[in-house]
Amino acid sequence: MPTINQLVRKPRVSEVVKSKSPALENCPQRRGVCTRVYTTTPKKPNSALRKVAKVRLTNGFEVISYIGGEGHNLQEHSVVLIRGGRVKDLPGVRYHIVRGSLDLQGVKDRKQARSKYGAKRPKAA
């Protein structure tokens, strides 16, 4: 434990918290335009073709973001909304695209966890 004198000479320095999603700049979401829509493969031990998009945001950042759910209608120049949240097995992917917002449609025929995928409530049959 330091003495008062030592603390006067060199005060305690608090740790600087680094943002996990710097491109959002403390906003909950950001709008952007897709510059490239493609698939990529995850790290070992997983194997798949994950759908991702390179997005140029309104604040000038260019980020890679993940397109969740089965099937999508994104193309180059689609306007999308991105939120934070990384994909653990895709290095460099620190953002998710919000389904059912702007140009990206919700997941078709989704019955459970619909709010996460922008799916409307199915008509009662």
Swiss-Prot record:
This protein is called what?
A: Small ribosomal subunit protein uS12
Main role? With S4 and S5 plays an important role in translational accuracy.
Keywords associated with the record = Methylation, Ribonucleoprotein, Ribosomal protein, RNA-binding, rRNA-binding, tRNA-binding
PROSITE patterns recorded: RIBOSOMAL_S12
On subunit structure and binding partners, the annotation says: Part of the 30S ribosomal subunit. Contacts proteins S8 and S17. May interact with IF1 in the 30S initiation complex.
Q: Which domain of life is it from?
A: Bacteria
| Cellular component aspect of the GO annotation | small ribosomal subunit
For this protein, the record's InterPro entries field holds: NA-bd_OB-fold, Ribosomal_uS12, Ribosomal_uS12_bac
Q: Which GO terms describe its molecular function?
A: rRNA binding; structural constituent of ribosome; tRNA binding
| Pfam family membership, one | Ribosom_S12_S23
Q: Name one GO biological process term.
A: translation
Name the SUPFAM superfamilies for this protein.
Nucleic acid-binding proteins
Which Gene3D superfamilies does this chain map to?
Answer: Nucleic acid-binding proteins
Query: What species is this protein from?
Result: Cupriavidus necator (strain ATCC 17699 / DSM 428 / KCTC 22496 / NCIMB 10442 / H16 / Stanier 337) (Ralstonia eutropha)
Give yes or no: UniProt keyword Transcription regulation.
Answer: no
Which CDD domains does the annotation name? Ribosomal_S12
At what positions is 3-methylthioaspartic acid found? D89
